[in-house]
């Protein structure tokens, strides 16, 4: 992959849990590529959503020690977008102009703000293009 790309929360849920083995391999490869290439990006929101799921829905729930390891080894190298006035403004515009939910618009705005060309997610419409950003579902 030559361009920067953004990973949505569900990629990490599949990569770091045992819940859906069929998606774990694909998600794990994307996370590995993101870290190894230095071209993968996540936002504060992805980290927050991931840990919310990991602590409440993983079976068994992720332990604090596992969370510390995931934060240091997986998320720290990728975390590049934090909340800002401009991020919220762009997300509001995306919600208004594209009928995207608020939380999804924050993800899209974060990907755009970090100049990503691809947003990997299964929650948005595969193939949709928003400016220079293309949505891609890696599980299709």
What are these regions (language model features)?
Residues 1-42, 57-65, 69:
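Short, well-structured N-terminal submotif of metal-dependent ribonuclease cores
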Residues 2, 108-140:
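Acidic, PIN/NYN-like endoribonuclease modules and their adjacent C-terminal/linker elements
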Residues 7-8, 43, 100-101, 123, ...:
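Histidine- and aromatic-rich ligand-binding microenvironments
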Residues 15, 33-37, 53-57, 74-78, ...:
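Alpha-helix C-capping/helix-to-loop hinge sites
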Residues 43-47, 67, 87, 107:
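Short, conserved alpha-helical segments within structured domains
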Residues 47, 59-75, 82:
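Glycine/small-residue-rich phosphate/adenosyl-binding loop
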Residues 76-122:
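Active-site neighborhoods of divalent-metal-dependent phosphate/nucleic-acid chemistry enzymes
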């Amino acid at each position: 992959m030559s361009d920067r790309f953004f990973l949505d929360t569900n990629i990490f849920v599949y990569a770091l849990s045992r819940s859906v083995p069929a998606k774990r391999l694909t998600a794990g490869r994307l996370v590995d590529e993101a870290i190894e290439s230095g071209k993968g990006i996540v936002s504060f929101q992805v980290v927050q959503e991931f840990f919310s799921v990991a602590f409440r829905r993983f079976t068994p729930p992720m332990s604090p020690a596992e969370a510390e390891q995931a934060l240091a080894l997986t998320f720290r190298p990728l975390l590049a977008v934090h909340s800002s006035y401009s991020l919220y403004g762009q997300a509001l515009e995306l919600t208004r102009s594209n009928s995207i939910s608020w939380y999804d618009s924050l993800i899209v705005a974060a990907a755009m703000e970090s100049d990503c060309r691809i947003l990997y997610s299964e929650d948005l419409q595969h193939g949709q293009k928003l400016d220079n950003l293309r949505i891609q579902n890696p599980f299709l």
